Amino acid sequence: ATFSEAPPGDPKAGEKIFKTKCAZCHTVZKGAGHKQGPNLHGLFGRQSGTTAGYSYSTGNKNKAVNWGZZTLYEYLLNPKKYIPGTKMVFPGLKKPZZRADLISYLKQATSQE
């Protein structure tokens, strides 16, 4: 399934998902530091493995995917399958609505100045 077939995302629900499943390892605010995972500010349109100051796996650097709705939708289903060798231990979100909600939240949260 593709992002275009996903239900419309709810950023409020996506924020809850981020706080419970992602915030332990990621930040979204501009200028916030890296944690176990990289800061996600400016994520949309950025190439994987290119955030300054974060040490990525070779798999992430070599994948060279441009992050957007479609690529995140596929990645968040099964990160280790999408980018073999990724350091991200998160198993993924199987429910299409959860992925759509999270992407909707990330679009807002990672673009705020």
Curated annotation (Swiss-Prot):
The modification N-acetylalanine is found at residue 1. The keyword Transport applies. It holds the Pfam family Cytochrom_C. GO terms for cellular component: mitochondrial intermembrane space. The modification N6,N6,N6-trimethyllysine is found at residues 80, 94. Binds 1 heme c group covalently per subunit. It comes from the Eukaryota. Gene3D superfamilies: Cytochrome c-like domain. The keyword Iron-sulfur does not apply. One of its GO terms (molecular function) is metal ion binding. It comes from Ginkgo biloba (Ginkgo). It is found in: Mitochondrion intermembrane space. There is one amide at position 24 or 29, probably one at 69 or 70, and one at 97 or 98. Signal peptide: none annotated. Heme c binds at residues 22, 25-26, 88. Keywords: Acetylation, Electron transport, Heme, Iron, Metal-binding, Methylation, Mitochondrion, Respiratory chain, Transport. Belongs to the cytochrome c family. Electron carrier protein. The oxidized form of the cytochrome c heme group can accept an electron from the heme group of the cytochrome c1 subunit of cytochrome reductase. Cytochrome c then transfers this electron to the cytochrome oxidase complex, the final protein carrier in the mitochondrial electron-transport chain. This is Cytochrome c.
